[in-house]
Amino acid sequence: MVSNHGVERVIPLCTGNPIWRMSLKILIARLNHETNTFSPVPTPLAAFDPVYGEDAYQANLGMRTAMAAFIDLAEKAGATLITPLSAMANPSGPVHACAYDELTACILAAAPGCDAVLLDLHGAMVAENTPDGEGDLLERLRHALPTVPIGVALDLHGNITQKIVDNSSVIVGFKTYPHVDMYETGEHTAQLVLAMLQGKSSYSVHWHPLPLMSHTLRSTTLYGAMRRAVQTACAGEGPELPAISVFAGFSLADIEAPCVSVVITCLNSLNGKALAEEMCDHLAKQIWAERAEFVYVSEPLSDSMERALVLAIDADRPVLLLDHSDNCMSGGTCDTMDVLQAAVSHGLKNMAVGPLCDPQAVNIMFKAGIGSKLDIALGNKVALNPQGLVKQPMQIKGTVRALSEGTYTASGPIYTGQLCSMGRTVLLETDVASIVVTERPHEPFDIGVFHIVGLDPSTYRFLLLKSRMYCRPVFEPLAHALVECDSPGPTSSDYSLFPFTRVRRPVYPLDQM
């Protein structure tokens, strides 16, 4: 039965579950956006590639998203699934007000009559008409469903707010960055909500925010203070504290508190609440004592290039160059040319590069066709507000080697099974580099970004990617060494480039504390 944007899918009830005398209805939806309020990249409705109803259900089957886990566990439990929406946009500027209103209205329209809600959200969405996209949605859902369990799976980079906490029954955040536990986070969330539906448990949510704006490159769980914080959280989980999450926050958002926080879902008992308060305080003190380790200090770009050249001597695998100041998954344009220009000027050769986003150049190269030799202006076509930087495109001579419609299926481990679209895609070959140029900004989190144009990145001396962390599970094992490259891009780690006016002060490291 389809109503509005929702589809009702009835699964036979599991046997041996006398508590459920009829099929319970569970609303399951996905709405993901991490907002960089300084990004010049717009976020209209089309950026989300939204799918509705039955299509939303089908789009998540076989994937490793939190929503996919919700579907799997709810079906196993014998619930009736309502799947009004699945929508995800790459990080970019504030969500257009009309897009936010339409997407949230779709979820809200499906809420009446539901016995539980499972939401796959990000936690750092800012729209033109609200600084707290998730909090406002959850508040309206709670008003519509005052007594039903609402479980939320969130990204590790969520900017948690009072509204998010007050209107959620269960909150679970990713425990990895790069994010390779999306599905597991969804499982965790769904298990707790199903326990509530079966009358086995009741939960309370506790929150401890810190005045700490972490740099994204220091929020990885591969090493350092964030890894230790997550290890403490995992060690503390148990029957009375079933979910302990450490959120690094997303600092490139000019809102009240784009900060680190600790969120605990605990048993709704005196002892459970007391343990939650104790653990929140313990984790917050641990993080604050190591706050300096959440700050990233970059080296000059010229030093990075010289270091890359030294590392490449006698290397039998590529040296990985990460252009993290123009990272698509933090709101970058994938358009800045600083790092590629520096690489060329320092004499780096035999490079695989990409994806660079330049729809104008793509259009020219598609019209020219495979085999065409061109002298083309590439990149630096999007103004880098708020820095006000206007740069000239890089003039490049090369040959069009491959053309593609730019669609591939991610092989994982990030977004496994997801259909990805880079728009029309070109492989441009120059004397020193093979460059993948796309119509849409796209994070290189999957080997498919190169394979789609017939390029094997492992055969090059240098591999230049516009990425911070998402690329690492796939590309770091292929590399001899890794060099992080900074520049004045839209996702730079240099906070002085961004005019924060709404952030509550004092806050570290903007202020010495």
Predicted regions and their residues:
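Short, Lys/Arg-enriched N-terminal segments with co-localized hydrophobic residues
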Residues: 10-23
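Glycine-rich phosphate/diphosphate-binding loops that line cofactor/substrate pockets in enzymes
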Residues: 23, 76-79, 83, 109-117, ...
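N-terminal amphipathic/basic leader segments beginning at the initiator methionine
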Residues: 23-73
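Active-site histidine-anchored catalytic micro-motif
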Residues: 27-40, 93-104, 112-201, 318, ...
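Extended hydrophobic packing segments that form well-structured cores
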Residues: 64, 83, 288, 407-513
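Low-complexity, highly charged intrinsically disordered N-terminal segments
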Residues: 72-104
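Conserved anion/nucleotide-ligand pocket segment
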Residues: 195-233
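Hard-cation-handling environments
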Residues: 217-431, 436-440
